From Swiss-Prot:
Name of the encoding gene: pyrK
Cofactor(s) demanded: [2Fe-2S] cluster; FAD
GO biological process: one example: 'de novo' UMP biosynthetic process
Domain FAD-binding FR-type: 1-89
Function: Responsible for channeling the electrons from the oxidation of dihydroorotate from the FMN redox center in the PyrD type B subunit to the ultimate electron acceptor NAD(+).
Co-factor note (free text): Binds 1 [2Fe-2S] cluster per subunit.
Full protein name: Probable dihydroorotate dehydrogenase B (NAD(+)), electron transfer subunit
Keyword Membrane among record annotations: no
Highest taxon in the source lineage: Archaea
Amino acid sequence: MLPLNATIVQINEESPLVRTFFFDFQFETMEPGQFVMVWVRGVDEVPMGLSSKNSITVQKVGEATSKLFELKEGDSFGLRGPFGKGFSLPSEGEKTLIIAGGVGAAPLAPYAEAARSAGSEVHTVLGARSAGDLLFEKRFAEAGKVYISTDDGSKGTKGFVTDVLTDLDLSVYDRIAVCGPEIMISSVFRLLKDRQVLEKSEFSLQRYFKCGIGVCGACCIDKSGLRVCRDGPVFSGVQLLDSELGKYARDASGRRVKI
């Protein structure tokens, strides 16, 4: 698949290191949780989760994302996709819990909106380092009740999303959707397992991608061999039992890197 040319029509600064780039067309069939391969001309092609049908939300962390931050309205980049498996939508009347940390809120914001539209009662636990780093709080609030946690206590509960979850009755939820830094995801995974609600959960994983379509095997998960780009990036909690989650990932050479 050749990249589509995406012209930037609007840039929102969500925080000093996070921006949302809106482009001039929509992925009408996008499932919340799917990703696109973003071709930053002259630099690299990198995977990004969609934060709406016509936007990606980018955290400045490396060469490719730094180059994206140099782009202005009217500039363009290439897009391939959407790829992968997104989050499963709830049925009408079901109760959904969303657990979002940092830039992991980006793919979960459209999921919250879609779940609400499907007739689900939506609750969100939204975490970040500080109040200024909270992403899409308004979008989550429009979908339902929001619980906030910040590392520094500048808003909501001081601590992590797991501190909020400890005080919630998780048995009342029919579906639980999780996305965020892997250290957060692994902590949530253990908590959900201990509370015996893991079978209700889905997690979005980040791994190094090369092809983005399941051919190269660079993003396979030990021990199952599931491909994050093709079989994921969203997996059920049960699928991730006895996996590498929270332990290590692989770099571009395939070498294990401790998380």
